[in-house]
Amino acid sequence: MSQRGLEALLRPKSIAVIGASMKPNRAGYLMMRNLLAGGFNGPVLPVTPAWKAVLGVLAWPDIASLPFTPDLAVLCTNASRNLALLEELGEKGCKTCIILSAPASQHEDLRACALRHNMRLLGPNSLGLLAPWQGLNASFSPVPIKRGKLAFISQSAAVSNTILDWAQQRKMGFSYFIALGDSLDIDVDELLDYLARDSKTSAILLYLEQLSDARRFVSAARSASRNKPILVIKSGRSPAAQRLLNTTAGMDPAWDAAIQRAGLLRVQDTHELFSAVETLSHMRPLRGDRLMIISNGAAPAALALDALWSRNGKLATLSEETCQKLRDALPEHVAISNPLDLRDDASSEHYIKTLDILLHSQDFDALMVIHSPSAAAPATESAQVLIEAVKHHPRSKYVSLLTNWCGEHSSQEARRLFSEAGLPTYRTPEGTITAFMHMVEYRRNQKQLRETPALPSNLTSNTAEAHLLLQQAIAEGATSLDTHEVQPILQAYGMNTLPTWIASDSTEAVHIAEQIGYPVALKLRSPDIPHKSEVQGVMLYLRTANEVQQAANAIFDRVKMAWPQARVHGLLVQSMANRAGAQELRVVVEHDPVFGPLIMLGEGGVEWRPEDQAVVALPPLNMNLARYLVIQGIKSKKIRARSALRPLDVAGLSQLLVQVSNLIVDCPEIQRLDIHPLLASGSEFTALDVTLDISPFEGDNESRLAVRPYPHQLEEWVELKNGERCLFRPILPEDEPQLQQFISRVTKEDLYYRYFSEINEFTHEDLANMTQIDYDREMAFVAVRRIDQTEEILGVTRAISDPDNIDAEFAVLVRSDLKGLGLGRRLMEKLITYTRDHGLQRLNGITMPNNRGMVALARKLGFNVDIQLEEGIVGLTLNLAQREES
């Protein structure tokens, strides 16, 4: 997430082209031509011993002879010279370099050289970059592109060229167009951080094939998507496609889970990609999800309606007032409804009257206008009239407008006019709906991610007990645990398992069955046979001693015949669970090579195909995220919403998924968990059969997770001056109600000191941003008083670090009636310790000169206090390294 050197890459003041040439079709010629044609307003320095000048620009024979150090260099020479040239650039002090091509054998040496000289690299095997707002075309693309608000980041040169060509035809603009290549150094997460703060960028589109660091990507994407829509197209869904791309991209459902968790939206194919570019370039942000459709034909409107229903879209309902205005304005044969079919004899005037009435209403959030080729309303004329009407209508800025001029030849000019006018336009009704639903789904994702999670009830965990059991099993050489062995581990996290006994032979199995009562189930115990069904290793509803003995002997006999080398550790004996009206589910935890542990929910079966049969989420889960997973499973028909007799307890299943998540987060020894079946009966969830694969683990537990979990280790009990003990802990998403209550106990004066303005009310979005934080990027500690089972927030302090993890902005707020207890100082001391241990160098903040308490506290804590009376602020800076030394 480092931003070091990105300014020199994306906003360079000078550029050197190493290997510039006058020979057409050479890389050095193409790069020089594009840089000069793009209108870059800084010096361009061609470096070549072969020419005195290149395209009229004085050339320099080598890097050492350059009159000054360029911000950016582009290597256009033979790849064999890359390392030597990069070394020279580093010694010259160049900050960034684009490497157009390099074999894999050079990668490590190039990375080491760049690191040694504190230089940033784009590529290798990069098409380059375009930054139209800077007049920069440092790429092979001969296509000039307009200035726009959409940034595009691609890991494929071929896709980049395709999009550039497509965008040129539609006169579509970009803020940045960056081809990453092999991402030897600069990667997508760093660019997301940069573009999130770029004023010229309002939306971001990504084409991805692989990730080098899933944790950094999810963190950066989540941060950026809170302010700007980000759409992703990810290739390599199948193993065959991954082999073709030479990537280890991981499970495709894991990508879906990560993209959704970060608040992004995934587009599925190239057709959707082009629609997404059109949408992000021209469409206004949605205010809601209600769609109004106008058409001059029933069939195109029906196609649009079918596409809308297939994606769970929402059709607007017109008010009676709007309907009456439409009846008065339109011919009698036009039925007033949504979709509104104006009929094939509709003129341009009918379109304009309808548009004017609808734009004055507030019955919808987006308006889709469909036009089929018609003699009554020629395509180009209708488009021109519509553009003028929208341009001059006072309420047009409040509605997202989408146009679909059907046909090819007759509508080509109309679509060009729409593009020039900045109105999104699409070729088909289905494509228009797809584009609309992209923005609806993005908006829904963001809304869901900001909902306040419910507090789970009776959620227990005994991490120490689970760790002890796992370590004992590992010490004994175990690599896989069965239901009997897993039972106490699951119980430590509050999960129910069916009581299980072990029988070494058929006689012992009969004895156990007699003790626990019939009917019973017998299951094979063998570490070498993962799927018991392969040898009919599960026998159910055994009702007598004779049936148990025969079933046990039959299992042993089948194993000897089919798996003579398999180790057999006896049988598991269980009472038969009451399955009447119950539903069988499956919960699996797998380890993905890119995203780490994944939690999968489905109904399973013998042939378990998670790509087709399960929904997937990244841990850690809270109640909201778990509930979304369950609902997603129901909507996608991966699980049923009810059994034959009763509905599925969504809240109960969500709580169980949270318990599974906590177990996986706390216990890195777990490599795989398979609960199958999980019996759902009313509010009871019972694991009937469980397999747990384990292995020793050393290192940072959190590093294996794509999302940093709640840092329990930072919790601390603190005694205040009045002798009261309170808990200092990181803030949680579930704290939103308590935070709102806390703010209500802070005086307006103290809030003014904190926020530099009068604040009447904090919205849910404000509070969600304060409580739903990324622990990798910021930290907020709350001081809480525990009373029975409730918590009361007494004070808050937070620090938000920059992407380079050098500086952090801090703030602290204490309940106004609790001043004088040392609460503010203790919170600040905890924050200082955390930021110093986290590797930050400086802690910065501002307050007002008349906030004497904060100024005095800062001085006591060692801050440098800079009083700026003219500005009306006091700057506070703490050098964390110096404080540690002192």
Curated annotation (Swiss-Prot):
Its EC number is 2.3.1.-. PANTHER family: COA BINDING DOMAIN CONTAINING PROTEIN (PTHR42793), PEPTIDYL-LYSINE N-ACETYLTRANSFERASE PATZ (PTHR42793:SF1). Residues 726-881 form the N-acetyltransferase domain. Residues 487-523 form the ATP-grasp domain. SMART domains: CoA_binding. Catalyzes the acetyl-CoA-dependent acetylation of lysine residues of a large number of target proteins. Acetylates RNase R in exponential phase cells and RNase II. Required for the glucose-dependent acetylation on multiple lysines of alpha, beta and beta' RNAP subunits. Also acetylates acetyl-coenzyme A synthetase (Acs) and the chromosomal replication initiator protein DnaA, and inhibits their activity. Overexpression leads to the acetylation of a large number of additional proteins and inhibits motility. Keywords: Acetylation, Acyltransferase, Transferase. The keyword Transferase applies. It catalyses: L-lysyl-[protein] + acetyl-CoA = N(6)-acetyl-L-lysyl-[protein] + CoA + H(+). This is Peptidyl-lysine N-acetyltransferase PatZ. The gene is patZ. GO terms for molecular function: ATP binding; identical protein binding; metal ion binding; protein-lysine-acetyltransferase activity. Disruption phenotype: Deletion mutant has decreased resistance to oxidative and heat stress. Mutant responds poorly to glucose. Induction: Positively regulated by cAMP-CRP. Up-regulated in the presence of non-PTS carbon sources. According to PubMed:22059728, pka is up-regulated during the stationary phase growth, while according to PubMed:22124017, it is absent from the late exponential and stationary phase cells. GO terms for cellular component: protein-containing complex. One of its GO terms (biological process) is response to heat. In the N-terminal section; belongs to the acetate CoA ligase alpha subunit family. In the central section; belongs to the acetate CoA ligase beta subunit family. It holds the Pfam family Succ_CoA_lig. Autoacetylated. Deacetylated by CobB. Changing residue 809 to A: Decreases activity at low pH (5-7), but does not change activity at high pH. InterPro entries: Acyl_CoA_acyltransferase, ATP-grasp, ATP_grasp_subdomain_1, CoA-bd, GNAT_dom, NAD(P)-bd_dom_sf, Succ_CoA_lig_flav_dom, Succinyl-CoA_synth-like. Stable tetramer in solution. Oligomerizes to an octameric form by autoacetylation.
